[in-house]
Amino acid sequence: MFCIIRAQLLLLLHLLVLALLLVGTVCNAHPQHGHPSELEPLALKRGGSPRDDGNTLAPRCRCIPGEACWPSTQIWDSFNRTIGGSLIKTAPLAESCYPGPKKNTRKCAVVSRKWTDQDFQTDSPVGRTYPYNITCAPVNYFAGQRPTTCSLGQLPVYAIDARTRQSVAQGLRFAKDNNLRVTVVSTGHDLLGRADGYGSLEIWLRHHRNEIRFERQYMATDGCRESGWTGSAIDIDGAYQWRDVHIKARANNVIVVGGGSVSPGAIGGWPSGGGHGPASRNYGLGADQILEAEVMLADGSVVLANHCQHTDLFRALRGGGPGFGVVLKTKIKAYPNVASVSVHHLTITPIRQTPNNSDLLDAVAVLMQAYPKLSDDGYAGYAFWLRNCKSFFIGSAKSGYRHGIWMIGKTTEEAEHSFAPVREALDKFKSKLTISESYMTYNDYWSFYTSESGLYESVGTTSVLTSRLIDRPAVEDYNRVREAVEVIGGKPEDYATNVMMLVSNGQVFADAADKSSGLNPAWRVSPYVVISSRGIPMVVDQASRKEVADDITYVKGAALQKLAPNTGGYMNEGDRNDPNYIKNFFGTIYPTHLATKKKYDPWGLFYCPTCVGAELFEETSRGELCRR
């Protein structure tokens, strides 16, 4: 079933979800901590020694349920009255499937049926479009499934339906007063579980929506003229998804750089971590689109970050990932629509299926060498391939390669001319592989997007993955490329999925001159990204999960790093367990971001795994978040 879903998603050129079957970007995946003066008594109460971090005294660990410092039911009830009854005591989505007072087979059947629906997941504060770890799986009793165990796991125990800025600030204040871990979630679309936290209070932004407004000519909120941008802009005031922003863009006949999937949040984690999509090669990554942002800091104050004020925070938001504050509002660039988008579709399947399918992998290596030149010519898009799949992948084949790549603003003739040398290079495989291709041209960007990408994908499954930015030197030698392809293709029983994302080059390279960019510099020299992933069953023991995770980190991830040793990975679709995540996700800019983190969040309130400053904390076996 995994392969069928993946084939459908990436066949339709789904961006990140497509290939990975993973998660939901948290606009802002970050927990919070507290003011030193407020937290010192809690540190002493817990018996831990207060830490002195500059001007900050704070307890070493956050409170968790069951401890003496955990708020009583009366305190939670009082807080709920303070915020107008918007506090939610969370419970697992599938708890109705398990023995106990909440068991309800009718509700369980509904949950099982809707589990893969993205709105079903997003409409719950503990819903995750691509959960990092499922600890209460739905049970299909009609299919003969039987319940195992059910718990919240790393999901929050309380959530605030934060529809106003005041309620966001009240939530942060309560968390600081009580030394609680906080997570911030808008869509729950995050691939690394950065929106999760054991025993946390969640600031749920799903309904924090005010307005999406089009500006024919961008005007900075404070009159700042340093951006140099004189084109159009879209003002996104609230935790909207890309599908909402796309409606406004299409109505005004402009292009915005959004996700290939429509479900991620348009502000916060997706752009701050990089943010790629069908238009990013031509117009820049999501991080490059941000013209300004309004951010709530840990003390509840709201600041404007742009080219004129809070410029260090502005830079961090444009590539440094989540964890600096709660992003409430952004303005992004918008571009004139185009008259044509030409798409090339290619499928390759073995004529004779074998366990290793070596001929297919030979062809994949040829294509990997061809991508930089195709990207130079203007091609962008997504490809994916599998050595083996448990079920049918392309037609009746259980292995194969498929891509949809396109040229924005160019004709079919130009697209054919560019791909012709690659097709010729593939001809040597025609006795062993079935190779099919076709072209399609659309008369504007949005006709292309709605047909080739941006569809409503199935969700709710878990994978682990690793990613690598691929520069030109990495693919100069065929034998080195083929060696890497062999490893990431995995053993026949791995059923690994590999995705090639031609989302860089073009304007992404040109934006290297932007001094306000906070992206890993490796983006500016790498035409494409490779992602290697493996699926994990909904119900699995930890030993089996660890075996898959270790394979991704120490086998497939290591092979990609060997292939491209001087680049890095894409933080929004990377390996949470990567021991070198600081170097791989941030590169040489990390010290700058860490200084910004310490300036705006000296208490580490907005902690999230693999985010800036995460190395200063650890999660204990009891689930506590503690300073090292």
UniProtKB/Swiss-Prot annotation:
Pathway: Secondary metabolite biosynthesis. GO terms for molecular function: FAD binding; oxidoreductase activity. It is an enzyme of class 1 (oxidoreductase). The keyword Signal applies. Residues 34-53 are annotated as: Disordered. Hypothemycin is an antifungal agent that exhibits excellent activity against Peronophythora litchii, which could be helpful for the storage of harvest litchi fruit. Hypothemycin is a strong inhibitor of a subset of MAP kinases such as human ERK2. It can therefore be used as an anti-cancer drug thanks to its inhibitory activity of Ras-mediated cellular signals. It can also inhibit Trypanosoma brucei kinase TbCLK1 which is a good candidate as a therapeutic target for African trypanosomiasis. Finally, hypothemycin also has inhibitor activity of T cell activation. Residues 1-29 form the signal peptide. Disulfide bonds: none annotated. Glycans are attached at residues 80, 133, 356. Keywords: Glycoprotein, Oxidoreductase, Signal. Belongs to the oxygen-dependent FAD-linked oxidoreductase family. FAD-linked oxidoreductase; part of the gene cluster that mediates the biosynthesis of hypothemycin, a resorcylic acid lactone (RAL) that irreversibly inhibits a subset of protein kinases with a conserved cysteine in the ATP binding site such as human ERK2. The first step is performed by both PKSs hmp3 and hmp8 and leads to the production of 7',8'-dehydrozearalenol (DHZ). The highly reducing PKS hpm8 synthesizes the reduced hexaketide (7S,11S,2E,8E)-7,11-dihydroxy-dodeca-2,8-dienoate, which is transferred downstream to the non-reducing PKS hpm3. This is FAD-linked oxidoreductase hmp9.
